[in-house]
């Protein structure tokens, strides 16, 4: 049951705020206040500043969003 009018973007978490809120800098330079989606919360996926994430934005309010996926970082360990 995916909503079709959402905007998907990628960005980097810049700040961790109380109540599982995060400030994300999107690839286009905008700062967005985001919260975690239910699947990330349920699976205990930890989000830290510096992580690259996918964000869903509503076309009605482009200043708030929801983190839907944490992208893998390229680490030096195999």
Swiss-Prot record:
InterPro entries: NA-bd_OB-fold, RNA-binding_domain_S1_IF1, S1_domain, TIF_IF1. It is found in: Plastid, Chloroplast. Transmembrane segments: none annotated. The keyword Transferase does not apply. The keyword Aminoacyl-tRNA synthetase does not apply. PROSITE patterns: S1_IF1_TYPE (PS50832). Keywords: Chloroplast, Initiation factor, Plastid, Protein biosynthesis, RNA-binding, rRNA-binding. GO terms for cellular component: chloroplast; cytosol. Pfam families: eIF-1a. GO terms for molecular function: ribosome binding; rRNA binding; translation initiation factor activity. Residues 1-72 form the S1-like domain. One of the essential components for the initiation of protein synthesis. Stabilizes the binding of IF-2 and IF-3 on the 30S subunit to which N-formylmethionyl-tRNA(fMet) subsequently binds. Helps modulate mRNA selection, yielding the 30S pre-initiation complex (PIC). Upon addition of the 50S ribosomal subunit IF-1, IF-2 and IF-3 are released leaving the mature 70S translation initiation complex. Component of the 30S ribosomal translation pre-initiation complex which assembles on the 30S ribosome in the order IF-2 and IF-3, IF-1 and N-formylmethionyl-tRNA(fMet); mRNA recruitment can occur at any time during PIC assembly. NCBIfam families: infA. Belongs to the IF-1 family. This is Translation initiation factor IF-1, chloroplastic. It comes from Anthoceros angustus.
């Amino acid at each position: 049951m995916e909503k079709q009018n959402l905007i998907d973007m990628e960005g980097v978490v810049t700040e961790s705020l109380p109540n599982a809120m995060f400030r994300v800098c999107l690839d286009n330079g905008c700062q967005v206040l985001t919260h975690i989606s239910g699947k990330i919360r349920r699976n205990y996926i930890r989000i830290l500043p510096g992580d690259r994430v996918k964000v869903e934005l509503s076309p009605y309010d482009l200043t708030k969003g929801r983190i839907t996926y944490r992208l893998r970082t390229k680490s030096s360990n195999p």
